[in-house]
Structure formats: structure tokens, C-alpha cells
Amino acid sequence: MLLYKPYDNDAALAYARRWALSRNPLFYNFSGVGGDCTSFVSQCVLAGSCVMNFTPDFGWYYRSVNDRAPAFTGVEYFWDFFTRVPAFLRANGGIGPFGRAATREEVTPGDVVQLADAAGDFYHTLLITAVREGELLVSAHSNDVYNRPLSEYDAPQKRFLRIEGVACAGMIPSCFAGLYTGRRLPFS
């Protein structure tokens, strides 16, 4: 039986503030090989959840550059994991952070936005890190930004992900300090 705990938006935001403009040495920098955006957002969400799902192919985890789930670093796979697409949910048992598609008005700092081109291909993942005078501010890697207005991105399509909680098999110790300081991956 799974237990549910709240997602810690504040921890995700603190992590983003610390690492948006630099790199945590615990994680490979994918900027030169497809982009580091989804990895960075995954790191932020991990800081706010401390739960990974180690199911090969359909999980959400990072141990090393060669031992990671596609959802930790891939835009579409990230969305499918978090929105619990049936194939993912059947394969991975639902452990880990989860969310749902949301409107712009429903998201808050700590939630996620993804950008698509005119053909509808989603290519960029960003963390919402603030709201100022009604404007969503985002942080991301690849082109490193912290609190950049979302309106400055020229993307024909956007989709929003509201992170609703974290499913776990038992009590989870905090991972924040080791992750935030770049000293230790959770459960490693």
C-alpha cells in the first residue's frame, strides 16, 4: 500500500535558487547533448520529494549518466511519468512525485511548464519559481536562467504541470541537505 505525502515546494524552490545558474556536481551536465533543462527540473522536484522510482524505462531516477530513467532527462518522458500515463503507471506502480495537467491559473511556484514548437513537439522544461504582478517567472538550465518571465519565451504552445504530491512505499528520510550541498544523491 502506498503512502502519500505533500510535495515540498519550498525545498524545490531553494534548490532552484542554489543551482539555476550553476551545476550540481552530483549530476551530469547534459547541455551539450540534448539539453540539461529536464534534468535540472527533475533535480528541483527531487529536492521537494526525496523519492525516486527505480523502475527501468518507466521510472524516474538518476544514479549516474549511464544509470538513469528516460523520464529524469527527457521532456516527453518526464510529462508521461508525472501525469501517470497508464503504461507508465502499470509498469512502475505509481511510486514517486506525481501531478496533473493544469491551467496557467492553477500552477504555483514549484510547479512545471513545458514549451513546444509550432508542430506541437515539446522541447523545453522549466520550473516556475515565482509569480510577480501576475507574471510567471521560471528557472531553467541549457540556457541558464533564474526568475525569467515566461512571457519572454517565444513558444507557440505551453503546457503546465501541477505537482500534487508524492507516493512512497514507506517513510522517506529527508534528502534535501545532501542534494542541496552537492554531497549525496538520495539512497546512494
Language model features with spans:
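Short, solvent-exposed loop/turn and secondary-structure capping segments
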Residues: 54-57, 125, 150
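Low-complexity, Gly/Ser/Thr/Pro-rich intrinsically disordered linker/tail segments
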Residues: 137, 141-142, 151-188
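N-terminal capping segments
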Residues: 1-76
